[in-house]
Design a protein with these regions (language model features):
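Basic/polar, cationic surfaces and motifs that engage anionic cell-wall
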Residues: 1-16, 85-180
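N-terminal catalytic cores of peptidoglycan-degrading enzymes
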Residues: 1-68
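Structural preference for beta-strand elements that scaffold enzyme active sites
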Residues: 21, 71-73, 125-127
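Acidic glycine-/aspartate-rich tracts in secreted/extracellular proteins
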Residues: 29, 79-81, 131-134
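Short coil-to-beta-strand
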Residues: 66-85
Length: 180
């Protein structure tokens, strides 16, 4: 199991490399990381909360269309066969939703990386792939056949509320962890 000290050391090694954004994803796979996911994301979080580091944070990884430079890609291993509908409250996770421990670990990792790299935990610097896709025109309400909706909605482990905006959940938990 990867420790917080390992995450902090990883972030320390990435200082002064121009990293100023973090993008959060789901892999569209099972709860275990595979070789394709390892190639695309800096960090993967498996269904049981196991954290897998895939190189250095300064390594170039292709995770978010036109947003890979100066960015870290972190993915939750989940959402195998999942589908979303134009009514976003109608997500079919196909038995592989993000687990509460994955969401907690994601927020924890963001908290420590953002602190070390001095990345503000706000909607400009830490976002889900769904949020980036909406900005860039290939989100849920665009017409792109390669639409992305990664972590559009999440259950909030802090409040117990279901189907909350994913970016808000992640940032809120990360900020809470940063302040406590």
């Amino acid at each position: 199991m990867t420790t917080i000290n390992e995450i902090i050391a990883l972030a320390e090694r990435a200082k002064n490399n121009g990293i100023n954004r973090i993008y959060c994803h789901h892999t569209g796979g099972l709860y275990k990381m595979n070789s394709v996911e390892k190639a695309h994301y800096h960090i993967c979080i498996e269904g049981d909360g196991t954290v897998r580091i895939n190189g250095e944070l300064s390594d170039y990884k292709e995770h978010t269309w036109h947003r890979n430079g100066g960015a870290i890609g972190i993915a939750l291993c989940c959402a195998y066969g999942a589908t979303v509908y134009k009514n976003p409250e109608r997500i079919n996770w196909n038995g592989y939703p993000p687990t509460p421990i994955q969401v907690e670990r994601l927020a924890e990792i963001i908290c420590f990386i953002a602190t070390v790299l001095e990345i503000p935990i706000d909607s400009e610097h830490v976002m889900t792939h769904a949020e980036a896709a909406d900005i860039d025109g290939y989100g849920l309400y665009g017409n792109d056949p390669d639409m992305r909706w990664d972590l559009l909605l999440l259950d909030d482990p802090g409040t117990g509320k279901k189907n909350q905006p994913g970016g808000d959940v992640i940032r809120g938990l990360a900020i809470w962890k940063q302040n406590n």
